[in-house]
Amino acid sequence: MAAGVDFGDLELFEAFDPPEESTPKPVHTRFKDDEEEEDDDDDENGVGDAELQEQLRRCEATIEQLRAENQELKRKLNILTRPSGILVSNTKIDGPLLQILFMNNAISKQYHQEIEEFVSNLVKRFEEQQKNDVEKTSFSLLPQPSSVMLEEDHKVEESCAVKNNKEAFSVVGSVLYFTNFCLDKLGQPLLNENPQLTEGWEIPKYQQVFSHIVPLEGQEMQVKAKRPKPHCFNCGSEEHQMKECPMPRNAARISEKRKEYMDACGEASGQSFQQRYHAEEVEERFGRFKPGVISEELQDALGVTDKSLPPFIYRMRQLGYPPGWLKEAELENSGLALYDGNDDADGETETGEIQNKNVTYDLSKLVNYPGFNISTPRGIPDEWRMFGSIPMQACQQKDVFASYLNSNIQSPSMRSSGKRSSSQSSPNSPKKQRKEGSAAASPADMELDSDVEIPPGSQSSKAFQFQPPLPPGTPPPLPQGTPPPLFTPPLPKGTPPLTPSDSPQARPAASAMDEDALTLEELEEQQRQIWAALQQAEGGNGDSDVPGDTPLTGNSVASSPCPNEFDLPVPEGKALEKPVLAEPQEPAASVDTAGPEPSCSPAAGAAVLSQREEEAAAEGGPGDALLDNGGVLNMNMSNGSNQQPIHPDSRPPMAPKTHSPVPDMSKFATGITPFEFENMAESTGMYLRIRNLLKNSPRNQQKNKKTCE
């Protein structure tokens, strides 16, 4: 029967909701059914009407009580309601400063006037600071989420300007101050959203009753030693370190205090201070984790079962083999080259070239991933479409990947042979010319005679070439990449100076001549010219050896007693481009008139030539043999008849020479750069003055002994 009675009053909510429209009161129409009509007919004494009247009286009493409460709420709400019609231009300054609720307390009653004066003094102080320093008075304090906005009186129509300035009437703090404590209901706003910059946010320190964990009944409480604070080992102060200690150093005290500190740190941590970690311990701790094997815990965490592939397998098909596990299977070489005196071709590197590290892989450490690099077990579906992936790739199979790693990794010998093949493929490259020149000009190679001729293009002739140690009279080889020096032997007596037409630069056609152009007579004449130049270089070291009309060039000091002037290697490529002899090509009769008549038969000429080659090998040093082999045999590019060139291997074998393994004393001065004097006027001509004294030097004496032998 209570369904037909309304409870509550809309007037209670008028203070919170704006009165937009007059809400009509609901009208309840109650229809009686047949049973109720029968009951009403039975209530002849009016019992039903009495109960209804009693309910109406109770409802009216409740309504009166709610009206009284509504009036009380309206009166209290007026205290926290902003006044209407106030325009605020600056929300940070023009709004209300604070709202004070004076309670019924003797202190607030007594100091009521002082509180108001204090507020007014704060306003004056702020205005003065704003005039002096604007930045000091600028704060970015946004209302906190717990702030409350003061509502305006709803009986007055709101203006747009007042609606836009509701931020000025936000309550950002509500504190009840008691004599012993205060109760903050809203908190405080943060300065620049930073609690450290906001005053009043210090964390209170409470008294700690228990410093250790309370043990269970029947167990002893284990007190853990505290870790000592770092302090000065010299004086014991905690305010500075030992290096900043003003007291004099006491080594014994410092050592003792340091030992105590280390022991205390070890006891506090429950283990040794200097603990060592071993790989075996790590393997035991993480031994249950194996790559490619999914445990039951991991399956539960991923939400997969034994009958499905994990989701990361489908992602691995797109990304490839994990690089971390590939690094585990990597066997990296240090890249250091060890030299034992043998010039191995494997360790041969060019100047400025960095030796690459040889990286190999242990194929047994490749991880098996079912569904990625090995086939999926039977009964497990491949759901790559559902995960947006790709099917299994044949290139990602374990055996294919292993063969790929083996094929892409070159051994050092393969890499060096590839380097040699690349140099052989380009005959005009400077690297090849340097290598061939050094191989042709080596004195040790000049003394070797082989019965079996190996084709120069074969791989065995390059990879398996015997390289004996250098003889004592041979200087160390120049570093690779150094341009070969051009030497000009001394000119014989009576030789006119060079003319521009006779210079080697003016005769480019001579370098392009055919090898079969010289006759035997011309070869013998050129050989005599070389021997005359060598004899003058060996025997005549005085100033009278060089005629006065001979111009001094940069290489005219070749007649000095330095024994290394003919020992340096001359590349073959340079020998083919320019003639070895720098003197002008004169007729044979004008150069050497005292020489024997050349033989007309080729056989006799060849015999004479081979005999003189043997004499040159016996008399001259390794440098003479170098000029003999590198200059005379390569003289077949001048003009002449179609005489066939004489091959170096066709001459009779020479007896091997025995040399001391210790280099000559004069070889230790090779490569020393002379000191250039600043005052060139005083140093000019000094060498010519002391040249006669240098003839008796130990170097020349040793050289003369070798010549006599």
UniProtKB/Swiss-Prot annotation:
TM segment ranges: none
GO molecular function: RNA binding; zinc ion binding
Zinc finger map (CCHC-type): 230-247
Keywords for the protein's UniProt record, in alphabetical order: Acetylation, Coiled coil, Metal-binding, mRNA processing, mRNA splicing, Nucleus, Phosphoprotein, Spliceosome, Zinc, Zinc-finger
Modified residues (N-acetylalanine): A2
Biased composition (Low complexity): 410-430
Effect of inactivating the gene: ZCCHC8-null mice have a small brain volume, cranial deformities with domed-shaped heads, and severe hydrocephalus with ventriculomegaly. Defective turnover of low abundance RNA polymerase II transcripts is detected in developing brain of knockout animals.
Modified sites of kind Phosphoserine: S601, S660, S697
Record-level GO BP terms: co-transcriptional lncRNA 3' end processing, cleavage and polyadenylation pathway; mRNA 3'-end processing; RNA splicing
Sites bearing Phosphothreonine, chain numbering: T474, T482, T488, T495
Region spans: MTREX binding: 661-709
Sequence segments annotated as region (Disordered): 1-47, 409-518, 533-667
Pfam families xrefs: PSP, zf-CCHC
Feature: compositional bias, Pro residues: 468-499
Record flagged with keyword Coiled coil: yes
Free-text description of this protein's post-translational modifications in UniProt: Phosphorylation at Thr-495 by GSK3 is triggered in cells entering mitosis.
Residue ranges with Polar residues bias: 552-562, 635-645
Cellular localisation: Nucleus, Nucleoplasm
Superkingdom per UniProt: Eukaryota
Keyword Coiled coil among UniProt keywords: yes
Function, in words: Scaffolding subunit of the trimeric nuclear exosome targeting (NEXT) complex that is involved in the surveillance and turnover of aberrant transcripts and non-coding RNAs. NEXT functions as an RNA exosome cofactor that directs a subset of non-coding short-lived RNAs for exosomal degradation. May be involved in pre-mRNA splicing. It is required for 3'-end maturation of telomerase RNA component (TERC), TERC 3'-end targeting to the nuclear RNA exosome, and for telomerase function.
Subunit-structure text: Component of a nuclear TRAMP-like complex, an ATP-dependent exosome regulatory complex consisting of a helicase (MTREX), an oligadenylate polymerase (TENT4B or TENT4A), and a substrate specific RNA-binding factor (ZCCHC7 or ZCCHC8). Several TRAMP-like complexes exist with specific compositions and are associated with nuclear, or nucleolar RNA exosomes. Identified in the spliceosome C complex. Component of the nuclear exosome targeting (NEXT) complex composed of MTREX, ZCCHC8, and RBM7 that directs a subset of non-coding short-lived RNAs for exosomal degradation.
Comment text on domains: The C-terminal part (659-707) contributes to MTREX RNA helicase activity, in part, by enhancing its RNA-dependent ATPase activity.
Family: Belongs to the ZCCHC8 family.
Entry protein name: Zinc finger CCHC domain-containing protein 8
Organism of provenance: Mus musculus (Mouse)
